[in-house]
């Protein structure tokens, strides 16, 4: 497929405000592609070259990209930088430069062979792999070779892609729907396969080649989508929901981790499926010493501890390990321990279809507990009073609360169901709990906030519809530093219209592709005719909103937009808050 054909679809997707139109455009594109192009097309649409755990990054900043455009188009770098400064869009700067360029002979577009999708993809992969001395010059040379042959519109999307600002906002669930339509594969079967093997490019090529989804199996080295929990605010409700009995375990304030063991090596993946092994060399060493298995996939929570007292530290202390050059120092200052709570795969056996109690038994058989690695403290209860005693014990030890699980539940990858329920200490707040919401819009600030965004439009994610529904407009809780950070973080996701996956009655000054997740709390959840979350779920014609919302200061970089709070959770929180909410 010619790259220009892909670019036409990308432009159409970018301009639509309808999700159904987006799916139709992508379906048509996939139908026209050869099987050996489908994976590359899917990666390009998602703005990636490989799945997140492979860690393939282009390493191209705006300045380097503009230097490559300058080299290809013969436009002075200063002119390109001026356009970029005015528009904030490196793609637009590239488009204008190549539109005005005088490229003689073979470099005149229309006279050379058009770019192919595979050709562009392979070149960008070379850009990502360029390393060591001379890597920057190599990246510029490779990119310039693409820009020299690209049409202005093609250059626009190549430039945006390489700096990580494609801004399409196409999610995996949207692509799964398009794949289902394009290749006649059942959507539910496709979703199940995706939960086991969340590599959209590889999965797309698999179905495009007509291969059966039964071949897709859980495999060490490939992270699965984690099972997620609902939330309730009383032990009696939790036990009733779980059929009278629950496995209750400490909810640690740390980083959820998938531990993959294979061939003597250990890899650690985050809940967003990113390879974070480099950040936890001490945990890798401890796992090798504590787990007696040739191949395994385990789940647990990595928690920072005080090196002097052994007391657990807040989740934020693990952020010191995110900077590669600071890991060695962080290991000394903020040592980590691993609390394991599940085993999904063990020496050739897929355990996800086995009941929780059996998985816990198998976990205890292979884990030799040490100071660094232990099994999360848990107990089986059928009495609400005993659950509450255990809950208060957990909170007094610095835990967030409990996670209560059905003893007979299987491991449902990618699902947020009622087999796992969070029971958290935030219950003392009128709103009962914090929520994780997605920034979909912003309002310009005034006074001392002038030049920045003063408030943000936030939304919940509904996995049933793959859409985002607004919950609140929040401007409280942000420090001056927070506002500056939010402005910088959100700029790559700024778009000229409401995103097709966002449902909103409010019109902010600026719209964003749903990407950034932040934690919010408020006075209460109230009925509101202004917001679209849970519209009609509690009362006809009104949705649910957060009254007096406040940013907690926590950026949920560990969560994808599709892992944000759901409308179903908002309804549960509304029902369980101490104060009965009235319409705004």
Curated annotation (Swiss-Prot):
PROSITE patterns: DNA_LIGASE_A1, DNA_LIGASE_A3. The active site is at residue 251. CDD domains: Adenylation_DNA_ligase_Arch_LigB, OBF_DNA_ligase_I. GO terms for molecular function: ATP binding; DNA binding; DNA ligase (ATP) activity; metal ion binding. Its EC number is 6.5.1.1. Gene3D superfamilies: DNA ligase, ATP-dependent, N-terminal domain (1.10.3260.10), DNA ligase/mRNA capping enzyme (3.30.470.30), Nucleic acid-binding proteins (2.40.50.140). GO terms for biological process: cell division; DNA biosynthetic process; DNA recombination; DNA repair; lagging strand elongation. InterPro entries: ATP-dep_DNA_ligase (IPR050191), DNA_ligae_ATP-dep_bac/arc (IPR022865), DNA_ligase_ATP-dep (IPR000977), DNA_ligase_ATP-dep_C (IPR012309), DNA_ligase_ATP-dep_cent (IPR012310), DNA_ligase_ATP-dep_CS (IPR016059), DNA_ligase_ATP-dep_N (IPR012308), DNA_ligase_N_sf (IPR036599). ATP binds at residues 249, 256, 271, 301, 341, 416, 422. It is an enzyme of class 6 (ligase). It catalyses: ATP + (deoxyribonucleotide)n-3'-hydroxyl + 5'-phospho-(deoxyribonucleotide)m = (deoxyribonucleotide)n+m + AMP + diphosphate. Transmembrane segments: none annotated. Keywords: ATP-binding, Cell cycle, Cell division, DNA damage, DNA recombination, DNA repair, DNA replication, Ligase, Magnesium, Metal-binding, Nucleotide-binding. Its cofactor is Mg(2+). SUPFAM superfamilies: ATP-dependent DNA ligase DNA-binding domain (SSF117018), DNA ligase/mRNA capping enzyme, catalytic domain (SSF56091), Nucleic acid-binding proteins (SSF50249). Belongs to the ATP-dependent DNA ligase family. DNA ligase that seals nicks in double-stranded DNA during DNA replication, DNA recombination and DNA repair. This is DNA ligase. It comes from Pyrobaculum neutrophilum (strain DSM 2338 / JCM 9278 / NBRC 100436 / V24Sta) (Thermoproteus neutrophilus). The lineage of its organism: Archaea, Thermoproteota, Thermoprotei, Thermoproteales, Thermoproteaceae.
